[in-house]
Regions:
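Gly/Ala-rich beta-loop-alpha elbow adjacent to hydrolase catalytic centers
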Residues: 75, 79
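Patatin-like phospholipase
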Residues: 2-4, 8-73, 85-295
Length: 295
């Protein structure tokens, strides 16, 4: 019996070795998606120049027609008026229609006697009426308005508050408009410190600045009446400041406005066309700068 048992044990099949299944192939991690190219923040810096400011409208029209939308806008003096209207949501066509129907006598609320010939409240009301009651911080495009603190001579950038008051302050040419009191301070034309507010567009976050200089170049002709003489004096002062301010612009536009003075409100369409031509001439350069700063 023992022999049979032993023989049975010897003839039992050996168990097969256990072989582990190979692990599934490891999939390589997916490549991270390519980052979406980020275009630079474009700032539009609109300079002062009184009635020559209609040229800013032509610049805006050409930008719109080419699908280029500024991310923010800063304005001085006449540039602050166009900047406020544009920031409120007005298109280039709407701005041109406003320019065509504008009655400059609405701005001339005379003040006798006073520290200026014009109070400026008419200008402030015009801005309020055409910006839909929006405050500066509520604008559809971020807006900055530059004025000069009369007490210390420093620049102030308005980014909050009543756009009418800010534009009035920014446009208050000394001796023409009364200084504008806001709180305990008095403010006058921003062109005294920043004729074209390039550095303020940078301060607001612009990575690429389009600067529009509409200042008049003295042509050697008689200035005529006192208003033209004052505006030309103001322009001469601003040109030396602009030499430094405009160095930081990525694209500089100087609309050609021969024989158009800052007091000439009859050349609106010609000024708009000059702005269009200035922007069209720099479109290729602007696209190159945008491409170079896209990352």
């Amino acid at each position: 019996m023992a022999a049979l048992t032993l023989a049975g044990c010897q003839s039992a099949p050996k168990p097969l070795p256990v072989v582990a299944a190979p692990p599934p192939p490891v999939e390589p991690p997916p490549l991270p998606p390519k980052p979406i190219p980020k275009a630079p923040r474009i700032g539009l810096a609109l300079g002062g120049g009184a009635a020559r400011g209609f040229a800013h409208i032509g610049v805006i029209q050409v930008l719109e027609e080419n699908g280029i939308k500024p991310d923010l806008v800063a304005g001085t003096s006449a540039g602050s008026l166009v900047a406020a209207l544009y920031a409120s949501g007005k298109s280039g066509a709407e701005l041109a229609a406003l320019a065509d129907s504008m009655d400059e006598s609405a701005f001339t609320d005379w003040s006798f006697p006073g520290r200026g010939l014009i109070r400026g409240e008419g200008l402030a009301k015009y801005v309020r009426d055409h910006t839909g009651g929006l405050r500066i911080e509520q604008m559809r495009v971020p807006l900055g308005i530059v004025a000069t603190d009369l007490d210390n001579g420093e620049a102030i950038l308005f980014q909050r508050g009543d756009p009418g008051v800010a534009v009035r302050a920014s446009s208050a040419v000394p001796a023409v408009f009364q200084p504008v009191r806001i709180g305990l301070r008095e403010y006058v034309d921003g062109g005294l410190v920043a004729p074209v507010p390039v550095r303020f567009a940078r301060q607001m976050g612009a990575e690429l600045v389009i600067a529009v200089d509409i200042s008049a170049v003295p042509d050697g002709n008689p200035t005529g009446d006192a208003m033209r003489m004052l505006l030309q004096t103001f322009s001469i002062m601003g040109r030396s400041i602009n030499t430094f301010e405009l160095r930081d612009a990525d694209v500089l536009l100087r609309p050609k406005l021969p024989n158009v003075s800052g007091a000439d409100f009859t050349a609106r369409k010609r000024s708009i066309q000059a702005g269009r031509e200035a922007m069209q001439s720099q479109l290729a350069a602007l696209r190159e700068r945008i491409a170079a700063k896209t990352h």
